[in-house]
């Protein structure tokens, strides 16, 4: 009996020692297990395998002995109250489609069926997207740019579709000099001028939820992709740009030449019209005349010019007006036939013209200057021309022909037997009782006044 009791005592002691090393406390010895740090963190991935969601948790302290530890989630589930996690190495996870995705859930760490520590969290606020994949870089030589494209599985998902992607790239020789670009699409364009020529670059992408309801963490980095930039071709010039530059240069040169040639004749008069200088005009008007002028008002200098008095011009005009009012116009053929019997005997029998004096401005026309005589004492000038002809000449007077005064008529008007022609009878009573004859029809003997030439400024 003594040997049997000793054996049971040693076994009990060994079991107690082994249980103490594994962190398992028995008989209410739970205070020793609470001395360790069992803090943990979790994240969710929605629709990882169809409708199933994934929730993963891990201890923040990697030195924690997790051999006998378990994870349990309660609340925020469909049809069940609690679910236990599965363990894969140092990670605890659960894949199910029973997450309610509304409200908070409680996750606890259990040791021997007892809760050591618990946390409350909302699964939709701890979403960690899946890492992007299939990162490609394509060089477009025409545009001198690199097009970066990648893919993500969230494009086909129902819940977390809107993501913000962070694209980073660097030179391979610069380990920590990353360039960051945030985009909401799966396509990015990098300009060649912002990259170093003939260099190798590394690029990768990660994502994060970009909605108000779903929040969480950055995803894992995608696999890195590498690309090389081409050599610098700054010495070469595009032929199209070269042709455009040459044509533009010659066009500008041609316009400059034409502007210089046509400036004075065509362009300047239109753009800047020349205005007369008022100063020069006033100087010419106010300028004193020269001493030796060709202008002279001496009457002797006008001896070679024929000057007519203004009184003669006025007398001629009054005679024209009187004759036009006194004598009727020419008779037409019918009147000539009607008067033919009396005219045949008087058909220019002597071809003489009778000149009668006229007192201009008086009451009685064609009165004789002597007063009471039977026939006016006027000279008769022979003429061999028909009635419609006039004698020409500078000194010969122009008179009406065919005007006859019958015998026995005293201070009477001329008979209206023949029509008057273009000649006009004028009488200039310069001397009392002696009639003067003046031509009124010829343009050569029209009265004019000769004035001196005006001085022209040279």
UniProtKB/Swiss-Prot annotation:
Q: Which InterPro entries match?
A: FN3_7, FN3_dom, FN3_sf, Hempt_rcpt_S_F1_CS, Ig-like_fold
**Start and end residues of each Fibronectin type-III domain:** 131-232
Record carries keyword Membrane: yes
Q: Where in the cell is it found?
A: Cell membrane
Q: Which residues carry this modification: Phosphothreonine?
A: 281
The listed location of motif WSXWS motif is 218-222
Q: How does it sit in the membrane?
A: Single-pass type I membrane protein
PANTHER family documented for this protein: CYTOKINE RECEPTOR, INTERLEUKIN-7 RECEPTOR SUBUNIT ALPHA
Q: Note what the entry says on domains.
A: The WSXWS motif appears to be necessary for proper protein folding and thereby efficient intracellular transport and cell-surface receptor binding. The box 1 motif is required for JAK interaction and/or activation.
Name by which UniProt lists this protein: Interleukin-7 receptor subunit alpha
Q: Which organism is it from?
A: Equus caballus (Horse)
């Amino acid at each position: 009996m003594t040997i049997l009791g000793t054996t049971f005592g040693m076994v009990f002691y060994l079991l107690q020692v082994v249980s103490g090393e594994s962190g398992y406390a028995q008989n209410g010895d739970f205070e020793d297990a609470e001395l360790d740090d069992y803090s943990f963190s979790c994240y969710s991935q929605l629709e990882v395998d169809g409708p199933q969601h994934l929730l993963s948790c891990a201890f923040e302290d990697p030195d924690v002995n997790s051999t006998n530890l378990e994870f349990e989630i309660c609340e925020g589930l469909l049809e069940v109250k609690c679910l236990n996690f599965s363990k894969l190495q140092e990670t605890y996870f659960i894949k199910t489609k029973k997450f309610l995705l509304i409200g908070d859930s409680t996750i606890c760490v259990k040791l021997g069926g007892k809760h050591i520590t618990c946390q409350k969290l909302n699964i939709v606020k701890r979403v960690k997207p899946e890492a992007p994949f299939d990162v490609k870089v394509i060089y477009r030589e025409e545009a001198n740019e690199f097009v970066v494209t990648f893919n993500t599985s969230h494009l086909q998902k129902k819940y977390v579709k809107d993501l913000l992607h962070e694209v980073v790239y660097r030179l391979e020789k610069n380990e920590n000099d990353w360039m960051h670009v945030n985009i909401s699409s799966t396509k990015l364009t990098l300009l060649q001028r912002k990259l170093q020529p003939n260099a190798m670059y590394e690029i990768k992408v990660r994502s994060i939820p970009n909605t108000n309801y779903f929040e969480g963490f950055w995803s894992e980095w995608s696999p890195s992709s590498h690309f090389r930039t081409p050599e610098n071709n700054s010495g070469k010039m595009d032929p199209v740009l070269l042709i455009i530059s040459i044509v533009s240069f010659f066009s500008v040169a041609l316009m400059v030449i034409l502007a210089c040639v046509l400036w004075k004749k065509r362009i300047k008069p239109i753009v800047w019209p020349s205005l007369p200088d008022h100063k020069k005009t006033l100087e010419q008007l106010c300028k004193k005349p020269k001493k030796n002028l060709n202008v002279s008002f001496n009457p002797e200098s006008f001896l070679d010019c024929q000057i007519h008095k203004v009184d003669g011009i006025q007398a001629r005009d009054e005679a024209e007006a009187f004759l036009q009012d006194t004598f009727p116009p020419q008779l037409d053929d019918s009147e000539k036939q009607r008067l033919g019997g009396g005219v045949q005997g008087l058909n220019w029998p002597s071809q003489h013209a009778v000149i009668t004096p006229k007192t201009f401005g008086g009451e009685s026309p064609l009165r004789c200057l002597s007063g009471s005589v039977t026939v006016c004492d006027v000279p008769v000038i022979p003429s061999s021309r028909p009635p419609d002809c006039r004698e020409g000449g500078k000194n010969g007077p122009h008179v009406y022909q065919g005007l006859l005064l019958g015998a026995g008529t005293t201070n009477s008007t001329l008979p209206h037997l023949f029509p008057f022609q273009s000649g006009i009878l004028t009488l200039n009573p310069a001397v009392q009782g002696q009639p003067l004859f003046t031509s009124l029809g010829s343009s050569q003997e029209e009265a004019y006044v000769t004035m001196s030439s005006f001085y022209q400024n040279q």
